Design a protein with these regions (language model features):
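Non-heme Fe(II)-dependent double-stranded beta-helix
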Residues: 1-15, 20-115, 120-124, 161
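Short hydrophobic-aromatic micro-motifs
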Residues: 19-20, 132, 201
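Internal hydrophobic scaffold segments of catalytic domains
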Residues: 25-38, 136-158
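Glycine-rich, charged/polar anion/phosphate-binding loops
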Residues: 117-120, 133-134, 187-189
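Double-stranded beta-helix
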Residues: 141-201
Length: 201
């Protein structure tokens, strides 16, 4: 089971991220994997941005190929107490699920997500929120793991630039359209988020 300890909560507040010590239960992990695979199989032509809100029939105005039952599967995952109980340890008892996203990065596609702060994409004030990222495969520096810059959340919202997502030859070179101005942070301070399938950060 996932388990965020009191020391993990303090680490989250200090560093801006935490990796769960435990793993999702086999039942919940299989439920996520089944919903994820069905969604990807039906929508494999979509960009990363277009894979937002799989729990809503008309999420973000996107035209997903999905059934009402699949939406309900994602919604039930997002409301699952195994996940929500850990979020409550960080944010408190009054929490809502306001978004979900399937991040599908196929091998050898080169879809790099630029350095960013999640809050720049969220029209929410105050930004008393957190992301729960669940790995469905083992992830390390060799297959595109996330990276964090410890304590950068204490710097407030850093300047972001609009990223040109298309190369001169017309190829898509990345995902998401905002990136932190390189003058605002030191990438050498980053930490690789290496986790096993079924873990969460």
């Amino acid at each position: 089971m996932l388990n965020i300890s009191s020391s993990d909560v303090e680490s989250y507040k200090e560093n801006g991220f935490v990796v769960s010590e435990g793993h999702l239960s086999t039942e919940l992990f299989n439920e996520i994997l089944q919903a994820y695979n069905e969604f990807i199989d039906k929508n494999n032509d979509l960009s990363l941005e277009e894979m937002a809100s799989p729990h809503l029939m008309n999420g973000a105005g996107l035209k997903h190929n999905k059934s009402k039952e699949l939406c309900e599967s994602f919604l039930n995952i997002g409301k699952n107490n195994e996940i929500v109980s850990q979020v409550m340890k960080i944010l408190g008892d009054d929490v809502i699920l306001w978004g979900m996203h399937c991040m599908h990065k196929e091998a050898k596609t080169g879809k790099k997500i630029p350095w960013h702060q999640d809050g720049t994409y969220w029209p929410i004030e105050p930004k008393a929120t957190c992301s729960v990222w669940i790995a469905i495969t083992d992830v390390d520096e060799n297959n595109g793991c996330m990276k964090f810059i410890p304590k950068s959340h204490k710097l407030g919202v850093l300047p972001h630039l609009q990223e040109d997502k298309v190369t001169n030859d017309g190829e898509l070179k990345g995902s998401l359209d905002l990136k932190i101005d390189e003058k605002s942070f030191d990438e050498n301070e980053s930490i690789n988020c290496i986790i096993k399938k079924g873990q969460a950060s």
